[in-house]
A protein has these predicted regions:
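Hydrophobic faces of well-ordered beta-strands that scaffold small-molecule active sites
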Residues: 5-9, 41-43, 73-75, 103-107, ...
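A conserved active-site cap/scaffold subdomain adjacent to cofactor or substrate pockets
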Residues: 174, 178-193, 199, 203
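Flexible, glycine-rich active-site loops centered on histidine and acidic residues
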Residues: 2-4, 8-19, 81-144, 184
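An alpha-helical appendage that flanks or caps ligand/catalytic pockets
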Residues: 125-153, 194-301, 332-349
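N-terminal beta1-alpha1-beta2 module of alpha/beta enzyme domains
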Residues: 1-68, 344-348
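Acidic (Asp/Glu)-rich catalytic clusters
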Residues: 34, 61-69, 96-103, 178-179, ...
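Conserved, mostly hydrophobic/aromatic
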Residues: 5, 33, 37, 45, ...
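Active-site mouth loops of central-metabolism enzymes
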Residues: 9-24, 78-85, 158-168, 277-283
Length: 349
């Protein structure tokens, strides 16, 4: 099975820069990935986060679509408790009208922010998480053919069949994705604890649908591929600082890399950062290739790896995504070679 490669962007602000620069960087990265033939480029949704510019996800997706040619662009994801499904369908149906066969709709059941901000987003609606399965079904209806519609229709979404993806960081979403026969995307970049169990549940309980005949798993992982392991670890110190700033409640911009990470962080924070790296793809091309193979042995095969990186140096970030493509292509070539060899052995024993 060939692995596809894609990317997620939270549109972070780098230290010393502003929101406009972060959005420009988002577009520049999208154009780079478009040229590299990445499968898809997703943009997250976060609110009341001073270091991220991903609060108006649909607008950023449209802006990215306007500045790219081929790559699929979507949400990673739209946090459905924050939005009326009708509005989501209208927005994504409009984008699918403007950019046919290029729009994805990844859906999450968490608010993507703190509870006070979530309350401000949905005002008197406090049960959005529990309505998630019902609202996913409603979106499927809105994007479906005319004969499936009710009185309220999400024009121009009708008949657009925008692909839906169920996002998750726990086993709850795995059950829903399996039951509905939809692709499943696990947030291994920030909540890997239940990843193995969730993927197993999804694959075991999967029910074929009009969308998929068999399970389709995407895992999102922190990914930094550099010329050598030491350089990759150095670049990854920015990621560690981002993660620690979240736990401290400070939400700092992306910091420059440092060789003094152990001195900047507390022993507990440093241990946490090193533990997180165990489930990250950080290293040279050879190292990352081996890490992906180890990942498959532990978690089972996945269809697609969605890379996310907090690399301060923009050129190094672009280079990392180029190297990541090389890694996936090398793995796919080896897989194809092995398949051909097995076929040859069976035909000519």
């Amino acid at each position: 099975m060939a692995i596809k490669y894609s990317a997620l962007n939270l549109v972070p602000i780098r230290e010393g820069e502003d929101e406009q620069t972060a959005i420009n960087d988002m577009v520049n990265l999208a154009q780079h990935l478009d040229e590299l033939s990445y499968e898809r480029y997703w943009i997250a949704e976060h609110h009341n986060a001073p270091n991220l510019v991903s609060s108006a996800t649909a607008l950023l997706i449209q802006h990215t679509l306007e500045h790219t040619k081929h790559i699929r662009v979507g949400s990673g994801g739209i946090m459905l408790p924050n939005h009326a499904p009708l509005i989501v369908a209208e927005q994504f149906g409009t984008m699918a009208t403007l950019f046919p066969n290029r729009v994805d709709l990844g859906l999450g059941r968490a608010p993507g922010t703190d509870m006070m901000t979530a309350s401000a987003l949905r005002r008197d609606q406090h049960d959005g998480v529990y309505k998630f399965p019902e609202e996913v079904s409603l979106l499927q209806q809105y994007f479906g053919p005319a004969h499936q519609q009710a009185y309220v229709r999400a024009y121009p979404a009708v008949g657009k069949n925008v692909p839906l993806y169920i996002l998750g960081s726990s086993t709850d979403s795995a059950h829903l994705a399996a039951r509905k026969g939809l692709p499943y995307v696990f947030a291994g970049h920030f909540a890997p604890q239940q990843m193995k169990e969730a993927i197993e549940i999804y694959k075991t309980l999967f029910e074929p649908s009009d969308v998929l005949d068999e399970p389709y798993v995407i895992v999102c992982l922190n990914t930094i591929v550099a010329e050598n392991d030491d350089e990759a670890q150095y670049l990854a110190s920015s990621t560690a600082q981002v993660m620690v700033s979240i736990t401290r409640g400070r939400m700092q911009p992306v910091q420059p890399p440092t060789h003094e990470l152990q001195n900047i962080l507390t022993p507990r924070e440093y241990a946490m950062a090193m533990e997180r790296q165990k489930i990250s793809l950080i290293g040279s091309e050879n190292t990352v290739q081996q890490k992906i193979q180890d990942f498959m042995e532990t978690y089972g095969e996945v269809n697609e790896i969605m890379a996310i990186s907090y690399i301060y140096d923009k050129d190094m970030q672009l280079d990392s995504y180029r190297r990541f493509k090389n890694v996936i292509n090398q793995i796919n070539e080896k897989t194809l070679y092995n398949v051909i060899n097995k076929l040859s052995e069976s035909m000519y024993p």
